[in-house]
Amino acid sequence: MEERAVKLAVYGKGGIGKSTTSCNLSVALAKRGKKVLQIGCDPKHDSTFTLTGFLIPTIIDTLEAKGYHYEDIYPEDVIYRGYGGVDCVEAGGPPAGAGCGGYVVGETVKLLKELNAFDEYDVILFDVLGDVVCGGFAAPLNYADYCVIVTDNGFDALFAANRIAASVREKAKTRKLRLAGLIGNRTSKRDLIDQYVSAVPMPVLEVLPLVEDIRISRVKGKTLFEMAETDPSLEPVCQYYLNIADELLARPEGIVPRPAEDRELFALLSDFYKTPVREPALV
């Protein structure tokens, strides 16, 4: 029996680098011989920018233009080929201050199923905006096998990671969803990450170093893999994403996380800042 697609949902604090991480991870998965579809789930519709080099039309825009006649839409109307052979879709979003992001994600999945697109891929990756602030934006977890949380070594990102972990736990009550683990993005230290996972046990898939080219790649509209074609010094950075891809393709058991209570986590992480490890005084 043929294995079904691995479905991943990537979450994290707003601005933490989810889309940059998602695009590089998608290319890494493609380099492992997998057919990959990345679905951007953010009203800004810029998730796939570093794969395609431009802002592709959204599914919601296309549906509106076609009067929501699904039968008039073809795969080439909504699926765009990006770098490394990664296929890209942008869900789009409702007008600012109106509508529900979860509805948009649902319509996107509905259309892709109508087009039999889900059957064409080995990996489907949902790149989801910011923190899980409502049930609507937790909607991609309804379709995912694994959640991946992008963080850094800071208080706010880990606080958001804990809230996302709570959403995973809630969704896991009714479906086979697991947390694959954390990805530390662009950080020179990991002490606060380690402090967090010691209190809230969960896997750490990888911690990427504080490399400026990771940020620059977003501005250039290129993945690290594409930049490495002309700058081989970036190949070791690409290896981090390949390592993550290998871990996810192994279909890990994952976990149902047990997030900390907000006050408990606040105390844990703030105490870390209040009582830093001091260097021994020179005599």
UniProtKB/Swiss-Prot annotation:
ATP binds at residues 15-20, 44, 185-186. Its EC number is 1.3.7.7. Pathway: Porphyrin-containing compound metabolism; chlorophyll biosynthesis (light-independent). Keywords: 4Fe-4S, ATP-binding, Chlorophyll biosynthesis, Iron, Iron-sulfur, Magnesium, Metal-binding, Nucleotide-binding, Oxidoreductase, Photosynthesis. Mg(2+) binds at residue 19. It is an enzyme of class 1 (oxidoreductase). It catalyses: chlorophyllide a + oxidized 2[4Fe-4S]-[ferredoxin] + 2 ADP + 2 phosphate = protochlorophyllide a + reduced 2[4Fe-4S]-[ferredoxin] + 2 ATP + 2 H2O. Its cofactor is [4Fe-4S] cluster. InterPro entries: NifH/chlL_CS, NifH/frxC, P-loop_NTPase, Protochlorophyllide_ATP-bd. [4Fe-4S] cluster binds at residues 100, 134. Belongs to the NifH/BchL/ChlL family. HAMAP family: ChlL_BchL. Component of the dark-operative protochlorophyllide reductase (DPOR) that uses Mg-ATP and reduced ferredoxin to reduce ring D of protochlorophyllide (Pchlide) to form chlorophyllide a (Chlide). This reaction is light-independent. The L component serves as a unique electron donor to the NB-component of the complex, and binds Mg-ATP. This is Light-independent protochlorophyllide reductase iron-sulfur ATP-binding protein. It comes from Synechococcus sp. (strain JA-3-3Ab). The lineage of its organism: Bacteria, Bacillati, Cyanobacteriota, Cyanophyceae, Synechococcales.
